[in-house]
């Protein structure tokens, strides 16, 4: 019944008249007569390409479509690091990954770090958050940490279960992801009990785990999340015939980093076309369930009379490869993994507007402060999205080009054996690795090769060189890679010392246990050799 109400919601006018611009610095004090409420919904692993054509044809997402019709869609929004914790650290801090040293899912922000929500609270906003946060240090499994720390070791081990699908027994089951639905209910109840009669403006955050794959218990307790799980109810929202089977390069022709990722993700074996299509169908169905949770929030705002007083933002920490480039999960700069949804609607936001310029998740921080009329810190990596989306600035050309014509994304975690850096511009995607010399770069022309099947770095050396110079002007990536390399060794040594005589047993039974236990001495020796290289013997 929930989805039938979309037409009712669509009938209400969302955009309040925006006051005329006076040419001054943007801010809520000028843009809104009263400080608006703000609601941010962040899902996990949602491919941003599903929010616009042609990706939008494969699955029904009525509430995302509602936000598109009544708000602004950013067609080229990207994560600043395609993995949970570092991506969220960038979003909550407004700073690039290397500036906060949020290297992996274990190393994020300090628990006491001042986020945009903290700043808004100090300026009179009532704040609340529910669900997945995952931007501070100290979380995730031992396996996840050790795999990230040892990615430079000269071995190749499967770290994930083979991707698979699992259908819920009850055909009509709607609430498949129980934890997310409970958190959605908590957010709705908070709106009803706490926000509806409050004289304070509020900022509410809801973090969802969907459409992240589920754990795979059949692969053993130490394997990760490789199961795409849903019910027939959600599968009916998927246009099966519209599902595209991605093209794969032969294993022998893959970029070496891609091969490492595919192998560690357990994707180098044989997959039938039916398997691939089912994985993608189940993933899209999980996206449909995510959309319904977003819908619960939108409907609650409408029912409480808050919809015309609230800026609603929807995005995701990263995407999901769903078997593109012979991989699932994220940890990649390919579009399926790095491209995220980003939609904004509410009073003063332009309706039915599509923005094609590149933006990224570090832009959330300044946007939040800008909505609240709070002066923006000068050290932020991000830029406010209001000049691109607000009614107030639609005729103000001098505000249109404040955001630079590029975004930076970087990755330093597990399942990838080299620090990775992406510079995305209007046409080009340039990907550099490690020190810039030991691993060949990649260059894709997304205007002619949207599926990123042809690396043209060698074909266009001038473009490659120019983009590399631009990247180095933004980040000294060889130096950052060296810092991460040293961090990984130091953290591994601390961990090894902390478990003492149990080391051999513990490391053998992490997520890679199926491969490790075949030749445990070989892999221990490989780690020893890695630790000895460029390290202080006394430390080891």
Curated annotation (Swiss-Prot):
Residues 1-22 form the signal peptide. Its main location: secreted. Keywords: Calcium, Glycoprotein, Hydrolase, Lysosome, Metal-binding, Secreted, Signal. Its EC number is 3.1.6.1, 3.1.6.18. The active site is at 84 (nucleophile). Ca(2+) binds at residues 44, 84, 317-318. The conversion to 3-oxoalanine (also known as C-formylglycine, FGly), of a serine or cysteine residue in prokaryotes and of a cysteine residue in eukaryotes, is critical for catalytic activity. The 75-kDa precursor undergoes proteolytic processing to yield a 23 kDa form. One of its GO terms (molecular function) is glucuronate-2-sulfatase activity. Its cofactor is Ca(2+). InterPro entries: Alkaline_phosphatase_core_sf, ARSK, GAG-degrading_sulfatase, Sulfatase_N. It is found in: Secreted; Lysosome. Catalyzes the hydrolysis of pseudosubstrates such as p-nitrocatechol sulfate and p-nitrophenyl sulfate. Catalyzes the hydrolysis of the 2-sulfate groups of the 2-O-sulfo-D-glucuronate residues of chondroitin sulfate, heparin and heparitin sulfate. Acts selectively on 2-sulfoglucuronate and lacks activity against 2-sulfoiduronate. This is Arylsulfatase K. It catalyses: an aryl sulfate + H2O = a phenol + sulfate + H(+); Hydrolysis of the 2-sulfate groups of the 2-O-sulfo-D-glucuronate residues of chondroitin sulfate, heparin and heparitin sulfate. Gene3D superfamilies: Alkaline Phosphatase, subunit A (3.40.720.10). Belongs to the sulfatase family. Substrate binds at residues 132, 255. Coiled coil: none annotated. The keyword Amino-acid biosynthesis does not apply. The gene is ARSK. The modification 3-oxoalanine (Cys) is found at residue 84. It comes from Bos taurus. Glycans are attached at residues 112, 197, 266, 379, 417, 502. GO terms for cellular component: extracellular region; lysosome. It comes from the Eukaryota. It is an enzyme of class 3 (hydrolase). Binds 1 Ca(2+) ion per subunit.
